[in-house]
From Swiss-Prot:
It is found in: Plastid, Chloroplast thylakoid membrane. CDD domains: F1-ATPase_delta (cd12152). GO terms for molecular function: ATP binding; proton-transporting ATP synthase activity, rotational mechanism. InterPro entries: ATP_synth_F1_dsu/esu (IPR001469), ATP_synth_F1_dsu/esu_N (IPR020546), ATP_synth_F1_esu_C (IPR020547), ATPsynth_dsu/esu_N (IPR036771). Keywords: ATP synthesis, CF(1), Chloroplast, Hydrogen ion transport, Ion transport, Membrane, Plastid, Thylakoid, Transport. F-type ATPases have 2 components, CF(1) - the catalytic core - and CF(0) - the membrane proton channel. CF(1) has five subunits: alpha(3), beta(3), gamma(1), delta(1), epsilon(1). CF(0) has three main subunits: a, b and c. It holds the Pfam family ATP-synt_DE_N. Signal peptide: none annotated. Produces ATP from ADP in the presence of a proton gradient across the membrane. Gene3D superfamilies: 6.10.140.480, F0F1 ATP synthase delta/epsilon subunit, N-terminal. This is ATP synthase epsilon chain, chloroplastic. One of its GO terms (cellular component) is proton-transporting ATP synthase complex.
Length: 133
């Protein structure tokens, strides 16, 4: 059986499709969702949303938000998404290393916070590259 999933930002619909399985980047770890899942509202971390349909995974990088799950429907409300570009494995790895160094070298709380968000995005990009290759 399939479920419906919608990913929405404040200004647009990112996707509205069906899925066999959805994996969300929850605050305490990944949240796997199958058809018939118990009702749940959960906060989302910056990270990789994965949508599986017909044995094919589609990754979407989310920038924080909420998800509402209700049996056969998943609604994801996010601040923003990052478009997946044609980035290669080596480039994604370099971005992750650069983001890791930025966190280590941050001098102020704001720099550390900004760098940690970029680190989460870089990690999600690398995961996305692995799903696309």
């Amino acid at each position: 059986m399939v479920m419906n999933i919608r990913v929405l930002t404040p200004d647009r619909v990112i996707c509205s499709t069906t899925a066999d399985e959805v994996v969300l980047p929850g605050l305490t770890g990944q949240v796997g969702v199958l058809d018939g899942h118990a009702a749940l509202i959960t906060a989302l971390e910056t990270g990789l949303l994965r949508i599986k349909l017909n044995d094919k995974w589609t990754p979407i990088i989310l920038c924080g938000g909420l998800a509402e799950i209700d049996r056969d429907r998943v609604t994801v409300l996010v601040n923003d998404v990052e478009e997946l570009t044609d980035i290669g494995l080596s480039e994604a790895t370099q971005e992750l290393e650069k983001a890791t160094l930025a966190v280590e070298n941050a001098k102020t709380s704001k720099e550390r916070l900004d760098a940690s968000v970029e680190l989460k995005k870089a990690t999600a990009r690398l995961e996305a590259v692995n799903y696309l290759s």
